[in-house]
Amino acid sequence: TELKLMNIGIIPTELCPSECRFCLAPWKSSVEERSGRAMGGEEFRRIAEQAVRFANDRGLIITITGGEPFLELERVLYIISKAKTRVELTTSGYWAANMRTARRVLSRVESVVKDNKSKKFSFSLQVSVDFFHQEVVSSEDGKLREAIPVKNLANLVEAMLRECSLEICLLPKYTRYEDPLVYLLAELERRGLSPRITRKFYNPNLRVSVLGDDGKFDKPALLKAYLSFDSAKKQAFLLYTAVEGIGGASILEFEYQTFKDRTAEFLEQEKGERFPLMGLEVSDDGNVYPGAHALYSWCLGNLLETTLEEIAASLEYDPLIIALAEHPWKIKNIALEAKPELRGELEKASSPLVAIYKILEDDALRLYITKELAGE
């Protein structure tokens, strides 16, 4: 099957200063575990250069995630400097503890972005703002604190709106938990940056329950919007994304009935959703994984031993990749025939994609499914 990739992710580091209980990263390790595996600067440049070149040649979006990318600022700047396509960097904003630091870091990023003269290059700084990053936790001395303070996010956003030309995108989540975006906008208003929503776009495939004068009713969920601010000439972009129940987030309850219904349909029917491979992810140790923030179930190779071109070429003939794109229910059927007891676990999945993830994270079962698909 022909690969139709949209993005390639590059992870400068999988380390993170926060310890969010609901971290989606299923591979996330402790600092002690990661320290022995992470690369030095020159080795990382070798894999980053290859990943960026792969994206440039194919016009793919480069996503820089983590961990927390700004723990390795020099690596981030190197990736941006080499890109000839769109770059989207996601940060928790932990580092913007005060306005001085926010300005200093942003000015370095802005300088490299401005120096990149490629006609097809563009850059967006995306800031996570959700209950999971802003969760209030108890510290060892018994005091309450936010995992990533809203104040830090306000410093980052204010510096970008008032003093920086970079594109900014806020990333809240569809969730039944409290939305700290409200507190962030209130803090910005106290700083003279009163927000106004200028344009809204809704997701018709996801409906949320709200209370109105006539009781409870469902409405399409907000997908994205543009925010304008008083005393600032530029806008911020707002983009809602769903919480997938993988990694630490697998302990969450269903966020919305819509997801649960889709999972039930997928388990019962011989048709439905398809999951073509949309991206590849390159970790800070050179390992390459399939998927964009979802299918980190197995490693496809290491860039110190092979190339992305070779990996991509092999994926076009991979039975699992083909099945994901054309008939993922076959993966589900083979898995349930081999392990009927797995159904109860799959019924808890927050979406059909997460159900597939739960199947493929079992190494032995994944190998068995691959052999069955190849033998058809």
Locate each region found by the language model.
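A short local loop/turn or secondary-structure capping micro-motif enriched for an aromatic residue
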Residues: S30-E32, V87, E273, Y296-G301
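Short acidic donor-binding/metal-coordinating loop in glycosyltransferase active sites
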Residues: P12, G66-G67, V129
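A C-terminal junction/extension of Radical SAM enzymes
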Residues: E163-G291
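Radical SAM/AdoMet-radical enzyme domain recognition
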Residues: R45-T63, E72-E187
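Flexible mid-to-C-terminal extensions adjoining Fe-S/redox cofactors in radical SAM and related proteins
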Residues: D285-E376
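Canonical Radical SAM [4Fe-4S] cluster-binding loop centered on the CxxxCxxC motif
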Residues: T1-R46, F54, A292
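Pocket-edge positions in alpha/beta enzyme catalytic cores
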Residues: S35-M39, E68, L300
